[in-house]
UniProtKB/Swiss-Prot annotation:
Residues holding a ubiquinone: H201
GO cellular component, one term: respiratory chain complex III
Topology with respect to the bilayer: Multi-pass membrane protein
Protein name: Cytochrome b
Keywords carried by this UniProt record: Electron transport, Heme, Iron, Membrane, Metal-binding, Mitochondrion, Mitochondrion inner membrane, Respiratory chain, Transmembrane, Transmembrane helix, Transport, Ubiquinone
Function: Component of the ubiquinol-cytochrome c reductase complex (complex III or cytochrome b-c1 complex) that is part of the mitochondrial respiratory chain. The b-c1 complex mediates electron transfer from ubiquinol to cytochrome c. Contributes to the generation of a proton gradient across the mitochondrial membrane that is then used for ATP synthesis.
Subunit structure: The cytochrome bc1 complex contains 11 subunits: 3 respiratory subunits (MT-CYB, CYC1 and UQCRFS1), 2 core proteins (UQCRC1 and UQCRC2) and 6 low-molecular weight proteins (UQCRH/QCR6, UQCRB/QCR7, UQCRQ/QCR8, UQCR10/QCR9, UQCR11/QCR10 and a cleavage product of UQCRFS1). This cytochrome bc1 complex then forms a dimer.
Cell compartment(s), UniProt: Mitochondrion inner membrane
A GO molecular-function descriptor: metal ion binding
Residues binding heme b b566, per UniProt: H97, H196
Membrane-crossing residue ranges in chain numbering: 33-53, 77-98, 113-133, 178-198, 226-246, 288-308, 320-340, 347-367
Pfam families, per database record: Cytochrom_B_C, Cytochrome_B
Sites where the protein binds heme b b562: H83, H182
């Protein structure tokens, strides 16, 4: 008798992706973040759908519609805070997932890696537009500041900004289109995730040693399904602890004041997950230079496969590269801290040094250290 799981056209795709998928026998907990990101996306789409049922994308009523959700809708407060803090969990998982790829050399699957970088951009765009929707002070100021950056593009900049705004300032048209884009983008992200997995399953997963593991594969189910369930439990535990005990921990108090174009918050800053990029943007005194540095700070990830000069794929057996990698992580923490500080001494110079170090490590120090390690191993 034939097994439906292996013959049915739809069930077969699921089977080859999540059940009978050959997986390396030694992948660690760092490989859990793919499934956790999938879960985060599902949580965000579902909570977002229920929020959209009660939200109005009009400047006059947006803020009060969010208040209405929190006060009058059954479990509206829970849905709203799960959505807001779910975004934070999404980015934590994203950063760890990307960091894992950098450490273990997963970027050598460059189709998978490049789709991943595009996904990162898409998620960042979605999060930015979502932050504008409650129409609080920081929503308004953030939308104004970030969209204004496009005016740095020579010749077409000003026209482009006014086109995105749908007027001469951030107003009703801007809010409505941001809501439309914020709704559609997660579904585009879901489609890109499919492509990401398609490319990944062409090659199979990498593993901590970076050595080809074709000779030693195990089925994904039950080994990694049970392992993923543990990750899911920990993620849900963290998310619900955040939502139920301190839902506003990662938010900005300014966003509890309705948007007022006539008064600007003293310190405009984005959500914590954009602070590192915001610090890089602010550390360059020139507007266009800052915008380019901001874009390149993420786009630089696409250069990783080209900058890989080591004879070994993973950093597992490369202590010097490990050192440099963890300095890069510390540097990103420093940038995140600086992004949340006011623009004054000594934060300005710390931010500039941290920004220079960020690009130097990726473009110069890591490749150089890789070559030194090759020499030490007489390769």
């Amino acid at each position: 008798m034939t097994n439906t799981r292996k013959t049915h056209p739809l069930x077969k795709i699921i089977n080859h992706s999540f059940i009978d998928l050959p997986a390396p026998s030694n992948i660690s907990a760092w490989w859990n973040f793919g499934s956790l990101l999938g879960l985060c996306l599902i949580i965000q789409i579902l909570t977002g759908l229920f929020l959209a049922m009660h939200y109005t994308s009009d400047t006059m009523t947006a803020f009060s519609s969010v208040t209405h959700i929190c006060r009058d809708v059954n479990y509206g407060w829970l849905i709203r805070y799960m959505h807001a803090n779910g975004a934070s969990m999404f980015f934590i998982c994203l950063f760890l997932h990307v960091g894992r790829g950098m450490y273990y050399g997963s970027y050598t699957y460059f189709e998978t890696w490049n789709i991943g970088v595009i996904l990162l951009f898409a998620v960042m765009a979605t999060a930015f537009m979502g932050y504008v929707l409650p129409w609080g002070q920081m929503s308004f100021x953030g939308a104004t500041v970030i969209t204004n950056l496009l005016s740095a593009i020579p010749y077409i900049g000003t026209t482009l900004v006014e086109w995105i705004w749908g007027g001469f300032s951030v107003d009703k048209a801007t809010l409505t289109r941001f809501f439309a884009f914020h709704f559609i983008l997660p579904f585009i992200i879901a489609a890109l995730v499919m492509v990401h997995l398609l490319f990944l399953h062409e090659t199979g997963s990498n593993n901590p040693s970076g050595i080809i593991s074709d000779s030693d594969k195990i089925p994904f189910h039950p080994y990694y399904t049970i392992k993923d369930i543990l990750g899911v439990l920990l993620l849900v535990l963290t998310l619900m602890a955040l939502v139920l005990f301190s839902p506003d921990l990662l938010g900005d108090p300014d966003n509890y004041t309705p948007a007022n174009p006539l008064s600007t918050p003293p310190h405009i800053k984005p959500e914590w997950y954009f602070l590192f990029a915001y610090a890089i943007l602010r550390s360059i005194p020139n507007k266009l230079g800052g915008v380019l540095a901001l874009v390149f700070s993420i786009l630089i990830l696409m250069l990783f496969p080209l900058l890989h000069l080591s004879k070994q794929r993973s950093m597992m057996f490369r202590p010097l590269s490990q050192c440099v990698f963890w300095i890069l992580v510390a540097d990103l923490f420093t940038l995140t801290w600086i992004g949340g500080q006011p623009v004054e001494h000594p934060f300005i110079i710390i931010g500039q040094l941290a920004s220079i170090l960020y690009f130097a490590i990726i473009l110069l120090i890591l490749p150089t250290v890789s070559m030194i390690e090759n020499k030490l191993l007489k390769w």
